[in-house]
């Protein structure tokens, strides 16, 4: 009898738990907005790398892509995109083309939780590589 009572209480607890409505405030909404990606097209970027990056992003219907320049970054384009991609080319030239203020704008953009991808020289640009002109995102 004791075992039957315990099993009945366990069954009852399970039924009550399954019938409690979900708390919708804890569920995360899935965005239906496209992910807006800016591909850096500044001095030092290899045109083929820029074109191929843009073409690759266009394959995903849930993404919108545009090319951005140093002037665009200075004019706050980062406020209207979700991620930035720095493609391959000459990292030193890209570094110099961005300048100190735009480099800081990119750091601030990333610190807000926005996305950043560096491809080839762009990856070095984001790195902390000794003896290389880089933004030093890691410190």
Task: State what each model feature region is.
Residues 2-9:
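Sec-dependent signal peptide recognition
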Residues 14-17:
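C-terminal motif of bacterial Sec signal peptides marking the signal peptidase cleavage site
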Residues 19-25:
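Bacterial lipoprotein signal-peptidase II cleavage site
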Residues 25-32, 75-76:
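Short boundary motifs at domain starts and secondary-structure transition points
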Residues 46-129:
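Helical hinge/lid and interdomain linker segments adjacent to catalytic or ligand-binding clefts
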Residues 127-139:
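An acidic, glycine-rich "communication" segment
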